[in-house]
């Protein structure tokens, strides 16, 4: 008799359809955002990184190489499926002479630090943004992250001091 009851429970469990699992209605579920985080955000981040590096004077090939490295490091930190890092800033330190120093400090850059200051900070991320301690986080999309100045402006003022400004625009 006990064997028959167990068999009935298994049959009932197999009849549960995936559509009956309320993933969208569950505010703590991350499945609806899986595609957005793992596909859309890295693609846009890579394009913006390459665009910014080209504007700084790198060749297209060099910009593509640096853009790949930077975006792979940061997006891997943002993906829960790949574990994330302990600290994104130390992971990205020294990735390139343009991105390694921080606070808008650049080597041999004739135009301005403003472009670098914008998209470097958005690529690096932060401890809060990658949700290291909170296990049931509400995931973000690329639109919710600070938009780099590379995507917001087309002209830059040479010699403008950006260290006292926000990295992603003025309110």
From Swiss-Prot:
Superkingdom? Viruses
> Subunit info?
Interacts with the major capsid protein.
Q: What is this protein called?
A: Minor capsid protein 3
**GO CC field:** viral capsid
Q: What keywords would UniProt list here?
A: Capsid protein, Late protein, Virion
Q: What is its main location?
A: virion
Species assigned in the record: Paramecium bursaria Chlorella virus 1
Annotated membrane-spanning segments are none
Compartment annotation: Virion
Q: Which residues form a coiled coil?
A: none
Entry function: One of the minor capsid proteins that constitute a network internal to the major capsid proteins and outside the lipid membrane. The minor capsid proteins glue and stabilize the capsomers.
Q: What induces it?
A: Expressed in the late phase of the viral replicative cycle.
- Entry keyword annotation includes Transmembrane: no
């Amino acid at each position: 008799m006990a064997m028959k009851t167990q068999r009935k429970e298994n049959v009932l469990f197999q009849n549960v359809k995936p559509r009956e699992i309320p993933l969208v209605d569950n505010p703590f579920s991350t499945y609806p955002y899986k595609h957005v985080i793992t596909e859309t955000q890295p693609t846009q981040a890579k394009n913006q990184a390459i665009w910014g590096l080209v504007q700084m004077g790198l060749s297209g090939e060099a910009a593509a190489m640096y853009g790949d490295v930077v975006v792979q490091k940061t997006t891997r930190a943002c993906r829960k499926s790949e574990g994330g890092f302990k600290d994104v800033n130390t992971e990205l330190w020294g990735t390139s002479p343009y991105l390694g120093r921080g606070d808008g400090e650049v080597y041999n850059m004739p135009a301005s630090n403003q472009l670098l200051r914008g998209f470097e900070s958005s690529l690096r991320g932060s401890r809060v943004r990658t949700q290291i301690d909170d296990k049931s986080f509400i995931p973000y999309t690329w639109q919710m992250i600070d938009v780099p100045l590379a995507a917001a402006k087309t002209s830059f003022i040479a010699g403008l001091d950006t260290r006292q400004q926000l990295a992603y625009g003025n309110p």
